[in-house]
From Swiss-Prot:
Pfam families: Big_8, Gram_pos_anchor, SdrD_B, YSIRK_signal. This is Serine-aspartate repeat-containing protein F. The gene is sdrF. Residues 679-797, 798-907, 908-1018, 1019-1129 form the CNA-B domain. Residues 1125-1584 have a biased composition (Acidic residues). Residues 85-99, 146-168, 186-226, 255-266 have a biased composition (Polar residues). Belongs to the serine-aspartate repeat-containing protein (SDr) family. InterPro entries: Adhesion_dom_sf (IPR008966), Fibrogen-bd_dom1 (IPR011252), Ig-like_fold (IPR013783), LPXTG_anchor (IPR019931), SDr/BOS_complex (IPR051417), Sdr_B (IPR033764), SDR_Ig (IPR041171), YSIRK_signal_dom (IPR005877). Gene3D superfamilies: 2.60.40.1280, Immunoglobulins (2.60.40.10).
Length: 1633
């Protein structure tokens, strides 16, 4: 806004070309500047926000807005009293609501350049709350910003589009406007400014800083922002030296008559424009026409835009060879303007005019997204007593809009951001929003210039170069706003108030109450305060309450103001909706009619009264709106009264009810008067002063990108610009006065000497302002432009410091020619304050240098290299050769300093000692102990890198030489045959052993204490004896001799063979030269001998240790490892070839009582894989009544692949309890093919103790028909201990055709507990037809401990009938392969009472591969109680056709514990009807690495009722395909827990065809030890009677062999006859039963 200079109030200054011809507001201010009460934007820290220079306090209200009038008014006012014309005073509460607006001027910010703005708020007369409105940011544009020559230019161009005046007018001016950092900046500095661009661009924009200091232009830095360094507490300055910013020209004061054109203009207008633009370049008329014609010829003027014409002018102008240096150009965008300043008023050169064409205004981009808004709030500045969500706008209540912000460092000068107001809110308070505002920093610097657009209700802020000068800019907003009366028109209506700051939205609802009292005849309010035009706009509603006065006169008076003639209007209301509550009626609508001419308002000569005679116009109900404007004239409150009376006076009581007055109060106001203010320009030039003389020389060029700030006499910032490409700058629209111009000192530049010439136009005016990084110059405007304020800078000279770091080998402190530099030494440079400003390292030659240093004092510090020591300093007289030490001070004074050097030397030492043989192993060197020569010693640095290797000398000494201080590692290699002695024994480090690896430290001295001791490693022997243990007791007896030639193998603990030997003739063996450790000794069993019992007795040196013995040698020999063997008892080798065809009929009656106690401990590890394919067809008819109590614990892991076709019919009742723990590791490959046909009748009673190892291959084909009745009583006690490790791969294909007819009656009660782990792959095809009727009663409890390994291959054809009673203790190892085809028909009745206790502990590891194919037809009925733990993997494919008829009544109590892990894929179709009561505790832990593809197709129809409690642990992987059709009908009633003694009489009809008839009666008690390997195919007919005793003969019974044979034969015959008779009798008895 423009301020008029001080002068006579009534002086009229004519409309001069460079003066503002407008009625300014409150001109001729008294020492202070005013600010519009509007949007206030404050920058800086939130707790210390900057305030605008002036605070305006406005208080406004209309009478009807006053709280008192909002309540019921007094009875006096409720009636119309036409006779009472007296007015009420401001303080009368009962009469009117008055609003008082008080404007407060800040005491410290008077501004000679900006007139004061009048702030206004209507105050109710009776109550005058003094509400202070937050100050606006920009006094200039808010109070009043005359449009100066911009408006004139626009107007001129619009009204005179074809003017062709001379473009070189000496009175025109132009103002530069800068946009983007990378666009060209060009300003026209002289009074003669030629402007072809008629666009009015905004003023310079700027941005705030969070730093609260006044040095807004203190520093100016490099062209681009230092994004890598953003200190939060320090301003970073930036200078744009080498940029070519695009100029944005704002033509604010120009009288160019250049026609204004657009694309749609005519060709003639465009040609006139071209001619005028070319003329502005200052060329003669010939050249003007030539360029104009060239543009016309080369360009389609009809379609060309103004920009295209400008480009064509530039192109043509550049083609001409101008001799005039004023318009000669190098390039259109890089002008070199170097000219002497001979006149204080410089005209813009033709080259600058050409630049104007090339640099059209280029506005920046919107950066709303880079303005970060936080904590936005919208609150009410309440000054009356009402609800918090209600605002009284006519009482000058306002909204406070606050927010914090942060500006992104990428924002450039010319960029913009917006504050958008919503539909029902606008900026400012009672005053109209200012068109132009300024955003200032906390220290008053201009950060951005704002322009308010009423159409879009948006303020757009354009950043100034402040954002280029500083980084990390933060601050806060504090604005005021008010309801928008054009849209928020109703009282007591809720409106959403919304404002968008950048991209951040703040929104809140408020109720708006303007206080329109519709029951009053007169209601008035101040609609707004127009500070731009210095007036108050008032609105009066007449006859709003339909009182319809018969005769009325309206008049209004004002104090401290004058009514503006021509602005008093009268409108007749045709629609009452026009009388809006907001006192902002739309006077252009059809709801009102302008009837001013009918009533002719009269304004008094002094302007303080207006009269309107309505006469009788209101009598018929017409309503009127009166609008009037008041211009303040004094410093007091503007007080306006409104009257509607009969006679137009205040002398009667004939006044009508209504508002009587409003008051606008100004505090610290000033008088105003109308007039025009001349304005001028100030500026000049910033140049590069190459010769540093402070005077502009012809060859010295301008400096671009220098920040220039203009301040008033109170040091308040007014404007800021940046020098253009030619170094020029200019400030426009300035009034007379003295100003301060601040130039920011660019980085790496120094200000030139000031005032070094008597010619002010060419010398440098800027002087350094203390420690601030600015130079300051004064500029005075006295009725003319001042274009002499310039300043020069020169590049700050830089110097270098450095020298040399060397190794001072002779330690004399002086550099010698043969001494070399040390590389990579760290050197640090510090300033006089001790701050590090540079760090470097020496190069490969030891050189270093710091460059670019200014004059001053510095400190240089050298870091001592590792392993070096600083040499002595300042030796000798040659400063260039001595050492300055590790820290020295250097002064730079207009020259380089290359004498700062430092020397270091490297001290070296020795490390070593001694390696000795520590014969007594005490870890200390004794005098008698000697050194060990030839020991390898390795030296390593601290990083583990080997740096030296040596060996001990003849005396055991070693040494490493030439070592620097530091830590080293010494490693001793253990000599062959030696062992390291113990380390660090005793207190004397010089004689102890440091071990084989130790650390040696050198610290300024030799270290000769690193030694190591070793002693010879002892060797040991192991061995003893292998003997024949004739008495088999496992203990060496004196008479038992050694066995020679036995192979003994020595292995390490991992089983690797170390050595092998054999026993000598005495059975002795020995292994020597063994170290301490763990070993395995293996004895290979001599052929034909058996391992004796191991570890018998208590004498380890006398017992046998077994075949594999683990031995630990610990510092001593071990001669206790021996083993014994004995010969096998019998060795039989039989080769029998027998072909027998026997037909025997035997009737045997045997009664056997067997009591067996077996204790079996087996360790088996088995791995079996079975694949079975079975096809079964089962037809069962069972009648059973079972009461079973079964306790089963099963753990099964099965992997089976079976395909079975079975037809089985079985009836079994078994109760078995077996506890078996087996560990078996078996690997078997059995291929058995046996064909046996034997017919034998043997009766043998033998008691044998045999240990046999049989390898037999038999092929037997037997056909037997036996009818036997046997009663046997056997008592057997078997104790076998077997440990089998077998790996079996069995591929068996058996084809068995068996036809048996068995009639058996068995009743058995068995209790078994089995734990089985099986993996079988079998392929069996079996066709069996059995009809068995068995009745057996057996109670068996068996405890068996069996260890068997059998390998048999037999081919026998035997038909045998045998009755045997045997008591055997057998340990057998058999491998059998048999193929048998048997057809037997047996009828047996047996009564057995067997009591067996079986405790089996087996650990089995078996790997078997069996392929079995079976076809079985079975009919079975089973009742079993089993506790089984099985691990099976089965893959079965079964096709089962079962027809069973079962009627079962079962009471089953089963407790099973099952742990099963199964992976099955089954497809089953089952129809089951089951009633089950199951209590099961199932813990399933399956780690099944089994690939089970179980495809099960089953069709089963079963009806079962079971009560089972099962706990099973099974792991199964099954693949089964079964088709089962089962039809069972069973009716059984059985209760079996029986121990029965069965006497059976059997009649057997046996047809046997046998070539041999053998009758043998053998009673043998044999203890045999046999090892047989037989392969026999025998067809034998033998009759033998033998009695064998391998070692000890049986007691003589008194009978010879013949008697024995005969007795046996006769006994047999009689026994057979008796058995036959007995069998027939029993059979008969059974039948009768």
């Amino acid at each position: 806004m423009k301020k008029r200079r001080q002068g006579p109030i009534n002086k009229r200054v004519d409309f001069l070309s460079n003066k503002v011809n407008k009625y300014s507001i409150r001109k001729f201010t008294v020492g202070t500047a005013s600010i519009l009460v509007g949007a206030t934007l404050m920058f800086g820290a939130a707790d210390n926000e900057a305030k605008a220079a002036e605070d305006n306090q406005l208080e406004s209200a209309s009478k009807e807005e006053q709280k008192g009038s909002r309540d019921n008014e007094s009875s006096k006012l409720n009636q119309v009293d036409l006779d009472n014309g007296s007015h009420s005073s401001e303080k009368t509460t009962n009469v009117n609501n008055a609003t008082e607006v008080k404007k407060v001027e800040a005491p410290t910010t008077s501004d000679v350049s900006k007139p004061k703005a009048n702030e206004a708020v209507v105050t109710n007369e009776s109550t005058k709350p003094k509400t202070t409105e937050a100050p606006t940011v920009n006094e200039e544009s808010i109070a009043e910003t005359p449009k100066t020559s911009t408006t004139q230019q626009d107007s001129t161009e619009k009204n005179n589009p074809s003017l062709k005046d001379n473009l070189n007018s000496s009175s025109t001016t132009s103002k530069e406007s800068k946009t983007d950092e990378h666009s060209t900046k060009q300003a026209q500095m002289s009074t003669n400014k030629s402007n072809l661009d008629t666009n009015d661009s905004p003023t310079q924009s700027e941005k705030t800083s969070s730093q609260a200091n006044n040095d807004s232009t203190d520093n100016q830095s490099a062209p681009s922002k230092q994004l890598d360094s953003k200190p939060s507490e320090q301003k970073v300055y930036k200078t744009k030296f080498n940029d070519e910013p695009t100029q944005d020209v704002e033509h604010t004061t120009t009288k160019l008559k250049t026609p204004s054109i657009s694309t749609d203009s005519s060709v003639n207008d465009k040609q006139d424009y071209t001619r005028s633009a070319v003329a502005s370049l200052g060329v003669d008329s010939n050249e003007t026409e030539a360029i104009t014609n060239a543009v016309r010829d080369n360009l389609d003027l009809k379609a060309a835009s103004r920009e295209q014409i400008n480009e064509a002018i530039i192109a043509e102008a550049l083609k001409k060879d101008f001799s005039n240096p004023d318009y000669g150009v190098d390039t259109p965008l890089a002008l070199n303007t170097s000219q002497s300043k001979n006149s204080p008023h410089k005209s813009a050169s033709p080259r600058m005019n050409l630049m104007s064409l090339a640099a059209e205004p280029n506005s920046g981009k919107n950066v709303n997204d880079k303005v970060k808004i936080t904590n936005p709030t919208l609150s009410l500045n309440k000054s009356n007593n009402h609800a918090n969500n209600v605002i009284w706008p006519t009482s000058n209540e306002q909204f406070n809009l606050k927010a914090n912000y942060e500006l992104d460092d990428s924002i450039k000068e010319g960029d913009t951001f917006t504050i958008k107001y919503g539909q029902y809110i606008r900026p400012g308070g009672l005053e109209l929003p200012a068109i132009k505002t300024q955003l200032r920093s906390k220290d008053g610097s201009i950060v951005a210039n704002g322009v308010y657009d009423k159409t879009t209700n948006t303020t757009t802020y354009t950043f100034t170069n402040y954002v280029d000068q500083y980084q990390n800019i933060t601050g806060s907003f504090d604005l005021i706003a008010t309801p928008k009366r054009e849209t928020a028109i109703k009282d007591n209506q809720n409106y959403p108030m919304e404002v968008t700051i950048a991209n951040e939205v703040v929104k809140k609802d408020f109720i708006v109450d303007y206080g329109n009292k519709k029951d009053n005849t007169t209601t008035a309010a101040v609609a707004n305060v127009d500070n731009v035009n210095n007036k108050h706009n008032e609105v009066v509603y007449l006859n709003q309450n339909n009182q319809n006065p018969k005769y009325a006169k309206y008049f209004s008076t004002v104090k401290n103001g004058k009514f503006i003639p021509g602005e008093v209007k009268v409108y007749e209301v045709t629609d009452t909706n026009a009388m809006v509550d907001s006192f902002n009626p739309d006077l252009n609508s059809s709801n009102v009619k302008d009837v001013t001419s009918q009533f002719t308002p009269k304004v008094s000569a002094d302007g303080t009264r207006v009269d309107i005679n309505f006469a009788r116009s209101m009598a018929n109900g017409k309503k009127y709106i009166v609008t009037q404007a008041v211009r303040p004239t004094g410093t007091g409150n503007v007080y306006t009264e409104y009257w509607l009376t009969r006679d137009g006076t205040t002398n009667t009581n004939d006044f009508y009810r209504g508002t009587k007055s409003t008051t606008v109060t100004y505090l610290n106001g000033s008088s105003t008067a109308q007039g025009d203010n001349p304005t001028y320009s100030l500026g000049d030039y910033v140049w590069l002063d190459k010769n540093k003389n402070g005077v502009q020389d012809d060859d010295e060029k301008g400096l671009a990108g220098v920040y220039v700030t203009l301040k008033d006499s109170n040091n308040r910032e007014l404007q800021r610009v940046t020098t253009d490409q030619s170094g020029h700058y200019q400030f426009d629209n300035l009034q007379n006065g003295t100003y301060t111009v601040e130039f920011a000192i660019p980085d790496n530049y120094t200000p030139s000497p000031a005032n070094n010439s008597t010619n002010d136009a060419i010398d440098s005016d800027g002087e350094r302002d203390g420690t601030r990084k600015v130079v300051v110059a004064k500029g005075t405007i006295n009725n003319a432009d001042n274009m002499t304020v310039d300043t020069g800078f020169y590049l700050t000279p830089k110097y270098n410091v450095g020298d040399y770091v060397w190794e001072d080998t002779n330690k004399d402190g002086i550099q010698d020619d043969n001494e070399k530099g040390i590389s990579n030494v760290k050197v640090t440079l510090k300033n006089k304050n001790g701050d590090t400003i540079g760090t470097t390292t020496t190069d490969s030659n030891g050189k270093y240098e710091f460059t670019g240093l200014e004059n001053g004092d510095y400190t240089i510090e050298f870091e001592t290299p590792e392993g070096y020591t600083p040499t002595k300093q300042n030796s000798g007289s040659d400063e260039g050769k001595d050492s300055n030490g590790t820290k020295t001070t250097v002064t730079v004074k207009d020259a380089d300093n290359k004498t700062i050097d430092s020397g270091f030397y490297k001290p070296i030492y020795n490390l070593g000692d001694y390696v000795w043989e520590d014969t007594n192993k005490d870890g200390i060197q004794d005098d008698s102990e000697k050194g060990i020569s030839g020991v390898k010693v390795t030296l390593k640095d601290k990083n583990g890198n080997a740096i030296g290797t040596t060996t001990t000398d003849a005396s055991g000494h070693y040494q490493f030489k030439g070592l620097e201080n530091g830590s080293y590692t010494v490693e001793f290699e253990t000599p062959s045959g030696y062992t390291p002695t113990k380390a660090n024994s005793g207190q004397d480090i010089t004689v102890d052993s440091n071990g084989i690896t130790t650390t040696g430290i050198i610290n300024g001295a030799d270290n000769l204490t690193i030694d190591s001791g070793f002693y010879k490693t002892p060797k040991y022997s192991v061995g003893d004896y292998v003997w024949e243990d004739t008495n088999k007791d496992g203990i060496q007896d004196d008479n038992e001799k050694g066995i020679s030639g036995v192979k003994v193998t020595l292995k390490d603990e991992k089983g690797n063979i170390i050595s092998t030997t054999t026993t000598d003739e005495n059975g002795k063996y020995q292994f020597d030269n063994l170290d301490s450790g763990n070993y395995i000794i293996h004895f290979e069993k001599p052929e034909g001998m058996t391992q004796t019992t191991a570890n018998s007795g208590n004498d380890d040196e006398k017992d046998a240790d077994g075949e594999d013995v683990r031995v630990t040698i610990t510092d001593h020999d071990d001669f206790s490892i021996d083993n014994g063997y004995f010969d096998d008892d019998s060795d039989s080798d039989s080769d029998a070839d027998s072909d027998s065809d026997s037909d025997s009929d035997s009737d045997a009656d045997s009664d056997s009582d067997a009591d067996s106690d077996s204790d079996s401990d087996s360790d088996s590890d088995s791995d079996s894989d079975s694949d079975s394919d079975s096809d079964s067809d089962s037809d069962s008819d069972s009648d059973s009544d079972a009461d079973s109590d079964s306790d089963a614990d099963s753990d099964s892991d099965s992997d089976s692949d079976s395909d079975s076709d079975s037809d089985s019919d079985s009836d079994s009742d078994s109760d078995s309890d077996s506890d078996s723990d087996s560990d078996a590791d078996s690997d078997s490959d059995a291929d058995s093919d046996s064909d046996a046909d034997s017919d034998s009748d043997a009766d043998s009673d033998s008691d044998s103790d045999s240990d046999s190892d049989a390898d037999s291959d038999s092929d037997s084909d037997s056909d037997s028909d036996a009818d036997s009745d046997s009663d046997s009583d056997s008592d057997s006690d078997a104790d076998s201990d077997s440990d089998s490790d077998s790996d079996s791969d069995a591929d068996s294909d058996s084809d068995s055709d068996s036809d048996s007819d068995a009639d058996s009656d068995s009743d058995s009660d068995s209790d078994s507990d089995s734990d089985s782990d099986s993996d079988s792959d079998s392929d069996s095809d079996s066709d069996s037809d059995s009809d068995s009727d068995s009745d057996s009663d057996s109670d068996s409890d068996s405890d068996s401990d069996a260890d068997s390994d059998s390998d048999s291959d037999s081919d026998s054809d035997a038909d045998s009938d045998s009755d045997a009673d045997s008591d055997s203790d057998s340990d057998s190892d058999s491998d059998s392969d048999s193929d048998s085809d048997a057809d037997s028909d047996s009828d047996s009745d047996s009564d057995s009472d067997s009591d067996s206790d079986s405790d089996a502990d087996s650990d089995s590891d078996s790997d078997s591969d069996s392929d079995a194919e079976s076809d079985s037809d079975s009919d079975s009925d089973s009742d079993s109680d089993s506790d089984s733990d099985s691990d099976s993997d089965s893959d079965s494919d079964s096709d089962s056709d079962s027809d069973s008829d079962s009627d079962a009544d079962s009471d089953s109590d089963s407790d099973s514990d099952s742990d099963s892990d199964s992976d099955s894929d089954s497809d089953s179709d089952s129809d089951s009807d089951s009633d089950s009561d199951a209590d099961s505790d199932s813990y399933s832990d399956s780690d099944s690495d089994s690939d089970s593809d179980s495809d099960s197709d089953s069709d089963s129809d079963s009806d079962s009722d079971s009560d089972s409690d099962s706990d099973s642990d099974s792991d199964s992987d099954s693949d089964s395909d079964s088709d089962s059709d089962s039809d069972s009908d069973s009716d059984s009633d059985s209760d079996s827990d029986s121990d029965s003694d069965s006497d059976s009489d059997s009649d057997s009809d046996s047809d046997s065809d046998s070539d041999s008839d053998s009758d043998s009666d053998s009673d043998s008690d044999s203890d045999s030890d046999s090892d047989s390997d037989s392969d026999s195919d025998s067809d034998s007919d033998s009759d033998s009677d033998s009695d064998k005793n391998a070692k000890d003969k049986l007691p003589d019974t008194g009978a010879n062999e013949d008697h024995d044979s005969k007795g046996t034969l006769l006994g047999t015959l009689f026994a057979g006859l008796g058995a036959l008779l007995l069998g027939r009798r029993r059979k008969k008895d059974n039948k009768e039963k």
